[in-house]
Amino acid sequence: MCGIVGYAGRNAAAPVIIESLKKLEYRGYDSAGITVLSKGIETYKAVGKIVNLEVEIPKNLGGTVGIGHTRWATHGRPSTKNAHPHNSGGNPGKISLVHNGIIENYMALKEQLTGEGYVFNSETDTEVIAHLVHKHIYGKPDGKEAKCELLVGLREALKEIEGSYALAILSADEPGKLVLARKDSPLVIGLGKGENFAASDVTAFLNHTRDVVFVNDFETAVLSPTSVEIFDREGKPREKKIEKIEWDFEAAEKAGYEHFMLKEIHEQVTAIHNTLAGKVSELEGDIYLKELNLSEDEIRKLARVQILACGTSWHAGLLGKYLFEQLAGIHCDIDICSEYRYRNPVMNEGTLAIAITQSGETADTLAAVREIMSYNCPTLAITNVVGSTITREANSVLYTRAGPEIGVAATKTFTTQLTLLYLLAVKFALVRDRLSPDYVKSFITDLRKVPGQIQQILNQKEAIKECAEGFARSKSYFFLGRHLNYPIALEGALKLKEISYVHAEGFAAGELKHGPIALLDEGTPVVAIATRGQTYEKMLSNIKEVKARDAFVIAVADNKDTEITKYVDVVLRVPQSDELLAPLLSIVVLQLLAYYTALARNCSIDKPRNLAKSVTVE
């Protein structure tokens, strides 16, 4: 959840690091800091936005090697003393480092190091690493003579550490070097000319270089302005593949929109089109998923699909569960990743695990995938980030071709995740002779219409804005849906919570009478997703239930539905579509409703409080 950057080059390090940290702001943070090797270690920190850090840094700060960090508090409250970098070896110190991850045995290590004379100035787990590295190099807190190089001392320290980490470390005695290490937390190296970079995310340095190397678990690296050396866990040099990032940095700019989120809602038209490209054939009535390392015979033999996901991705997975069971006739379970490892899952032969993660770095999802792989279960990852950790660990990978998503609240990655789940379920159904090629041809025709239908919704966003502004000060919202619309109700409520800080709950509409209806007050806004389908009549009954309690009902319904207007206060329209695909349209309305509510409430839409884009700690 934190952002790490490192620089070794020919230019002044501080401006490069500050620029890179700003590119990582979308990950969420509460404080920031940098260290530059100038006349020894020089460290500057600040609470709050990066602009607060900038005013602390001297304009004439020299040094061409440095590290930086945006912190999201996990151990210790947001404060200057808890902000990274953390140093060891006196003031200003011999060692300085930044860390993303969690050290699980830090209390035992802290007690040990305190007994050896090390003084702790923060409440963080990270400071333990700084002192431990210092101890292995200098022997004691006031040690002046190095017994070994920084890389060797780091390797020895890592043998004592339990937990996850991405580390960037500097030593005052090795002024031209930046040393890195990784386990269970993302870290990537950017290769420049006369300069090299390190970061949690390629976005940090993409305007400097497109050539990158991804650091794997248990690898260490040494960067200088002119060289990059990478080593395995035994310390042997490794040759690594250089990958080129193809997408443009301009794709991550706002392009005239007020917020990234609004831009990304609009980009769903292109994102879904790109995700479908090369994967469907109307003429043949077939779906092509060449990245899927499963034969047709293996697909026929599947007895179970296990979906693993968190947050918005879990909502996509819940809809996927309905699709796999309804279309392909395959039993499907879905688990929240943070719970999965602790319930001793019963595994069966013929199970396919599908892990859904926007970033490919979600710590809980990676842990769940590793757990299920211990049962020799084949794994398929659905992610948006090429080269992310999950792409290197799963057996198969399907990419949502959504492009970079900067807004913390997921929009286009959600609809492209759904798109891939539709393709998977229909492909499995076709292979298992549950759907005919003629049906698949018709389905593909309808699916290809979705981007244009989303554009129609975007063209009427003023009506959604007007509705949102009318209820922006409401204290609580209900979102109701049945069957395929239930996951969309959950996602709509989550969007509103995330960016407008309004209490909102999504419910299966049939569950209202089992308790939630007691919460309804006069005028409570209830968003009812009531597109036509097999549960439409029951949904109308639920709407009548809440209207009888004087709730204000906002319906999401198709543009040919005249019946709905008799029972609700406002109708937000979507184009008429196949019942199966209606969720792809309804969610766009709810994304816009959340956006305009947050805008009316003057909230921080792209970087909501207390949230991070990439959740890389468990």
Curated annotation (Swiss-Prot):
Catalytically driven reaction(s): D-fructose 6-phosphate + L-glutamine = D-glucosamine 6-phosphate + L-glutamate
Keyword Translocase found: no
EC id: 2.6.1.16
Enzyme active site: 2 (nucleophile), 613 (for fru-6p isomerization activity)
Broad EC category: transferase
Superkingdom of the source species: Archaea
Cellular component terms per the entry's GO annotation: cytoplasm
UniProt KW keywords: Aminotransferase, Cytoplasm, Glutamine amidotransferase, Repeat, Transferase
Domain SIS: residue ranges: 295-434, 467-608
GO biological-process terms attached to the record: carbohydrate metabolic process; fructose 6-phosphate metabolic process; protein N-linked glycosylation; UDP-N-acetylglucosamine metabolic process
UniProt keyword annotation of Transferase present: yes
Gene Ontology molecular-function annotations: carbohydrate derivative binding; glutamine-fructose-6-phosphate transaminase (isomerizing) activity
Glutamine amidotransferase type-2 domain span: 2-226
Role this protein plays: Catalyzes the first step in hexosamine metabolism, converting fructose-6P into glucosamine-6P using glutamine as a nitrogen source.
Subunit note: Homodimer.
HAMAP family: GlmS
Protein name listed in UniProt: Glutamine--fructose-6-phosphate aminotransferase [isomerizing]
Gene coding for it: glmS
